[in-house]
């Protein structure tokens, strides 16, 4: 065993699995505590609201000593006496505020959608804080703006010009001054409703004519960010343009497809980068990996045990879990030698899983 690590945040399964596969003993503090999180962890603490997270960390820390602390979404800027393996709080703050991130991109001379002023439409409206794109919306007039502000009262936001293209990201590791791109990913978004811009899956690798520009911008941004470990830079990629959208200064939702496609272990790369060691350029991915998050299409209680589908599912809920309509239910995967083959197998697996959700 390489040591005992505590992974804490809203969702931790993907990081806990990577850490376990890297040879660490893992404990987790997690909002969901799904079945498969228990497979990769020695101990777990569940919490409901983010304000409960510090107390949950305190409870598990009284039961175990830890060699490393790795925060995920929701825990990035928590004060801790544990040995942090990731980006220090004083460097992470500007990437938790989308306006500060906007100014950072501009200071790096990296293309970014421009800010819109009051009354300028259409505009992409985003809360200044928050992950996953769940409250982002394209607003086309004052009526739509007023409706958004009524739906999310007292939420500070930014307004940007629209960028048209494919959502994508680059996974990097950085030691604080240098960076190495690990994988380029296509991102899937919900596409409709209040969560139209919410993350719901990825394909790795993402082959695109602008791939080299994305990698160059991502490594430039990651090296200048002052972050440590694995981080993700989100883009929108057009036919002849690239726009930087966001910096995720933590493990990203693309961990699974990056590891499946490349064969690397991101947790090992993360720890190495935090200790000042960057990997050599990775070989070309040996396969294409695709992930899709399935959501409840109605209020429902899932009585079926999905664990027999573990070869192509993750984030597996416990039987008897209640889901509100629109809540994330389970992740499904497909792999193949080509994008088409991976997506075909993904569709086949989704069909199988849906039979258990009736």
Label for each model-derived stretch:
Residues 1-96, 100, 324, 337-358:
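ATP-binding N-terminal substructure of ATP-dependent carboxylate-amine bond-forming enzymes
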Residues 5, 126, 172, 241-251:
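A short beta-strand motif that forms the metal-chelation/ATP-contact edge
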Residues 85-150, 156:
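A conserved helix-loop-beta module that forms one wall/lid of the active-site cleft
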Residues 161-226, 248-274, 282-284:
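ATP-dependent carboxylate/phosphate-activation module, predominantly the ATP-grasp catalytic core
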Residues 227-239, 282:
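A short glycine-rich, hydrophobically flanked beta-strand micro-motif that places a catalytic Asp/Glu
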Residues 269-358:
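Peripheral (often C-terminal) accessory segments that flank ATP-dependent C-N-forming ligase machineries
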